[in-house]
């Protein structure tokens, strides 16, 4: 799984960096030719895209390194750091768009040739949609937080390019302030995406539990297993591609230690079949000690 995960995530990061570089060159020409502030906004966003995608590529490769003596749980948290860094990059570009949009709203400047801007924006829109589709496929296969953050970023680019097309069309008919207004709107959307991305990254760094549906699946597997009378103290988190799962099994006091160990091993394998690549720790408790320790069984 880890090899497949690493291959897909690396390809997604390389594809994003290459696409952002191509779009940057196209947008530099379009902005130089038309003077459109909306295209300037898209150009700045492409610069941010390159920085974010390069950061993603480097961090993802680092996060795929196996655990070592100093990092017993691996390097998966680097993905969350990459997502957090992306949110900062994007927030900076949003601030630039606000300032530029306000300046051109106060002093609108007619564009030289909106038609060229329309053609360039359509090309950028098609390229970005192709990239987002590939990233979405990778996210479905890997659940990579870094690729998901990159995908959200490029999804905002799709919205941006659509807004730019509309702004260029309106400017063509003489409404020159439309360009600046759409730049402000794009900036608001980008800032919202950045804040949401940053929140998710921070939650991961703070070891947020797995989603409720996944935790319920774990509980269902454990509590339905023969020889298990109950369970408690389920603790979960995720670091990169690896889920960390800890749970206490409740077993009859009379169950021999060897048999209790076999049951725990079977439960562990069942969890791993459902969540491959997970790090699972199971502790066995006699039923009689659970009330004394103040634990509440998941079956009660």
Curated annotation (Swiss-Prot):
It is a multi-pass membrane protein. Gene3D superfamilies: Cation efflux protein transmembrane domain, Cation efflux protein, cytoplasmic domain. The chain crosses the membrane at residues 12-32, 39-59, 82-102, 114-134, 156-176, 178-198. The keyword Protease does not apply. One of its GO terms (cellular component) is plasma membrane. It is found in: Cell inner membrane. It catalyses: Zn(2+)(in) + H(+)(out) = Zn(2+)(out) + H(+)(in); Cd(2+)(in) + H(+)(out) = Cd(2+)(out) + H(+)(in); Fe(2+)(in) + H(+)(out) = Fe(2+)(out) + H(+)(in). The keyword Amino-acid biosynthesis does not apply. It comes from the Bacteria. Divalent metal cation transporter which exports Zn(2+), Cd(2+) and possibly Fe(2+). May be involved in zinc and iron detoxification by efflux. Homodimer. This is Cation-efflux pump FieF. It comes from Escherichia coli O1:K1 / APEC. The lineage of its organism: Bacteria, Pseudomonadati, Pseudomonadota, Gammaproteobacteria, Enterobacterales.
